């Protein structure tokens, strides 16, 4: 029995070191993002939809029109998080971390451009715009936008956690949201 418990403890500790977001956490995260956007009315909804469905070669959608809505979106997102626990904020930070990591790719950077920080902030913008746009960029990096940025989204839940609970959340993911940290996204040339 003690051998089994020791083995279980090691497996659990290892699993905690490389914790990935659950499907439930991801669904809750995207629902929260959508709720924050929905509260702002039809104009940003139409802009977001147009961004996610546009022809990246055409000039018929101004991708920067959404920038005026980012601060109200972030304020509303903050309001929606007021009653979240430490664990919930950590879970959401883990989701953001994973989403940023998954699009930390050279093919996305080729479209967005930017320094390491600039590319991180652009990926934050992609996440902030919502799931439909995020998935469009994942599938076709040409959908990304040159020099867009939302620095606040990159550490949004981590900052809330720090403000409310006095420390930075430990996501236990074993990955980094920083630029050029996803080796699968940056093949050696």
Where are these regions (language model features)?
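Alpha-helical structural elements
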Residues: 24-25, 32, 64, 117-120, ...
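N-terminal domain-onset segments
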Residues: 8, 12-101, 105
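Core of folded catalytic or high-affinity ligand/protein-binding domains
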Residues: 75-148
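Basic, alpha-helical nucleic-acid-binding regions used in initiation and control of genome expression
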Residues: 131-136, 140-189
């Amino acid at each position: 029995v003690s051998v089994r418990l020791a083995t279980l403890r090691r497996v659990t500790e290892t699993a905690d070191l490389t914790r990935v977001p659950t499907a439930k956490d991801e669904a809750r995260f995207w629902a929260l993002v959508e709720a924050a956007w929905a509260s702002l009315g039809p104009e940003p909804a139409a802009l977001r939809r147009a961004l996610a469905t546009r022809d990246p070669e055409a000039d018929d959608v101004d991708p920067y029109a959404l920038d005026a809505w980012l601060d109200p979106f972030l304020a509303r997102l903050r309001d929606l998080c007021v009653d979240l626990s430490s664990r919930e904020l950590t879970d959401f930070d883990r989701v953001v971390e994973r989403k940023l990591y998954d699009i930390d790719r050279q093919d996305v950077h080729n479209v967005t451009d930017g320094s390491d920080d600039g590319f991180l902030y652009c990926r934050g913008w992609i996440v902030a715009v919502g799931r439909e746009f995020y998935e469009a960029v994942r599938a076709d990096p040409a959908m990304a936008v040159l020099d867009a940025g939302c620095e606040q989204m990159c550490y949004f839940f981590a900052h809330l956690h720090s403000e409310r609970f006095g420390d930075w959340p430990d996501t236990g993911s074993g990955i980094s949201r920083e630029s050029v940290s996803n080796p699968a996204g940056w093949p050696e040339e």
